[in-house]
Structures are given as structure tokens and as C-alpha cells.
């Protein structure tokens, strides 16, 4: 039996400097090890150690569209300009689906 996809919005907090990252993630396991896509966040996880970061699931949605809409609402222009966030891009991106691709010989 196939597991149900969970469309989530999460927050990762750096426990040392209180910087945060808000992102979206599609998973079948809320306890997976995914820790965001920000290169700035990834750099700090390497520098400070994973033990100094906390991940919280803020919202779980039934659809991708609901998840994307919530991330757009939370990670807006004002949010990305804050000095306490790793987010540098507006929310709502990141999940792009390509159509069918054919390769001819």
C-alpha cells in the first residue's frame, strides 16, 4: 500500500543565533532528515553542527497548491529582508513539474 504524501511547511531554527528558515517539503515521513534547501542554512549546519538546529512542522496540507500558497504568504518580500532569516527568495517556488519529455533517436 502506497503511503500518503504529506505537503508540509516547516521552520528550522539555529539554536545558537536564532536565525530561522521557512520552507516547503513533500514527504511520506514527517520525521525524515530533510533540513532545507538554502545554501546559507546548509553552510551553517556544516559550521555549527546539526545538533544546534531544530526543525518544526508548522502546517500539513492535503494538496501541493495549499502548501505553496501558505509558503508564499509566510515567505514574502518583507520576510526575506529580515536579518534573522536564511530565506533569500520569495516562497512558493521550488516545486516545478516538467511535462513529458521524449527523446528521438
PLM region spans:
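Structure-specific nucleic-acid interaction/processing domains
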Residues: 1-104
